[in-house]
Amino acid sequence: MQPSGHRLRDIEHHPLLTDNDNYDSASSSSSEADMADRVWFIRDGCGMVCAVMTWLLVVYADFVVTFVMLLPSKDFWYSVVNGVLFNCLAVLALSSHLRTMLTDPGAVPKGNATKEYMESLQLKPGEVIYKCPKCCCIKPERAHHCSICKRCIRKMDHHCPWVNNCVGEKNQRFFVLFTMYIALSSIHALILCGLQFISCVRGQWTECSDFSPPITVILLVFLCLEGLLFFTFTAVMFGTQIHSICNDETEIERLKSEKPTWERRLRWEGMKSVFGGPPSLLWMNPFVGFRFRRLQMRTRKGGPEFSV
């Protein structure tokens, strides 16, 4: 096993901050308890566009399923069952998306690399700690700096523009649920599209929809393409995330081939750590732990961050 001083290649050694350093630590370093009461949001142009596109595509799919395929159907129970199922999956997917986007992924407080903070740690002789030169914080083990969030994130897996946030220690659960529910709703939409095409061909496109045949074909084709793309992407991401959790290894650690200096959790221990508690239906609930939080603009030097 390598010594702790060489275990992370992305860490640079810098002296700790002094009282004369040109860094506004008073305004940028807030307590973790205070940050827990605020909503987290990253003001990144690309991320916000991707997040809005995600919502629009889900709303489009819901429109086609509801108004093009189900409401015109003569089978009442077919429409009710599939309508309730698809809309539930859509709500769960969008809720998981919101929780992923608005949850602090595990950001390390900025500017805490001060002598006063160091003295409060009561370090053992010879113990090595690291300072991130970009956000001036004491960098915990397995934390990595995100250039978009402009923060060090604990157990950072990757930054996903589609949720406009990093996937890290505190929001990985919601990201996994988001990919799962999008994949399930995509499969459901593709099955409904197939049944709708069969129904329209048998009825010669006259009674299968309230829209004209050309419009119906265009809407269904676009939904099929969307469903295929969404299912492929989210199914792969879901499998990758589950594999990472079971192996207790983030995507960054895997890509950088970092040798583990921590004691890896067993497969079920990793799942329990991410989803909380023993296996239950609560694992699939994106509303667990939800509470309304206050929104507050915060000015950050040199960063597009607007965190809550």
UniProtKB/Swiss-Prot annotation:
Residues 72-75, 195-217 are lumenal. One of its GO terms (molecular function) is protein-cysteine S-stearoyltransferase activity. It catalyses: L-cysteinyl-[protein] + hexadecanoyl-CoA = S-hexadecanoyl-L-cysteinyl-[protein] + CoA; L-cysteinyl-[protein] + tetradecanoyl-CoA = S-tetradecanoyl-L-cysteinyl-[protein] + CoA; L-cysteinyl-[protein] + octadecanoyl-CoA = S-octadecanoyl-L-cysteinyl-[protein] + CoA. Its main location: Golgi. The keyword rRNA-binding does not apply. The chain crosses the membrane at residues 51-71, 76-96, 174-194, 218-238. Disulfide bonds: none annotated. Residues 1-50, 97-173, 239-308 are cytoplasmic. The active site is at residue 160. It is found in: Golgi apparatus membrane. One of its GO terms (biological process) is regulation of protein localization to plasma membrane. One of its GO terms (cellular component) is Golgi apparatus. Residues 130-180 form the DHHC domain. Keywords: Acyltransferase, Golgi apparatus, Lipoprotein, Membrane, Palmitate, Transferase, Transmembrane, Transmembrane helix. Its EC number is 2.3.1.225, 2.3.1.-. Widely expressed. Present in Sertoli cells (at protein level). It is a multi-pass membrane protein. Coiled coil: none annotated. Autopalmitoylated. InterPro entries: Palmitoyltrfase_DHHC, PFA4/ZDH16/20/ERF2-like. Golgi-localized palmitoyltransferase that catalyzes the addition of palmitate onto various protein substrates and therefore functions in several unrelated biological processes. Has no stringent fatty acid selectivity and in addition to palmitate can also transfer onto target proteins myristate from tetradecanoyl-CoA and stearate from octadecanoyl-CoA. Palmitoylates sex steroid hormone receptors, including ESR1, PGR and AR, thereby regulating their targeting to the plasma membrane and their function in rapid intracellular signaling upon binding of sex hormones. Belongs to the DHHC palmitoyltransferase family. The DHHC domain is required for palmitoyltransferase activity. Homooligomers. Heterooligomers with ZDHHC3. This is Palmitoyltransferase ZDHHC7. It comes from Rattus norvegicus (Rat).
